């Protein structure tokens, strides 16, 4: 199992393939992605790599983290993330991970944070149909209706779908195909949409449920 990398979402575009079909693409940028540290089975109980991306001002780094970056002999990074790996896939500390770490035609899993929607009603948050438009319904047309049962159990069960905060959740989209890799501009072009707003950070890993192919 290889390590993943951290990338930054740039935006979306579209291209036409040889058959004239329009393909939607999400562009992600891999800039200054380096190995910051190791986690070993003997010391930490599991094997992992700590990956960092995008240089950060030294004045905005805490003293403990300054020492971490000093030990790795690299400049401070804006975003850090651990990736579990198998024992034979360790990479040297301070090694750089470029866009050619992945290849066109390969399938990947993307983990990102969805865009926050604030406090949302049940119709927007859970796709409820709402109540009747007439026939005695007043004011509560977009309400979710009853949330409980009777005296027994006498409570609302945990996990009941109701209005509440929507978005800002970490989600993983599996089996997205890499359309192309642009090494000069440090871009990975991925087919389909990816969660998160522009300039947000995400992780790109080899797909675990699909065999990758190259075209």
Swiss-Prot record:
Residues 136-155 are annotated as: Disordered. Methylated by PrmB. Keywords: Methylation, Ribonucleoprotein, Ribosomal protein, RNA-binding, rRNA-binding. GO terms for molecular function: rRNA binding; structural constituent of ribosome. Gene3D superfamilies: 3.30.160.810, Translation factors. Belongs to the universal ribosomal protein uL3 family. This is Large ribosomal subunit protein uL3. The gene is rplC.
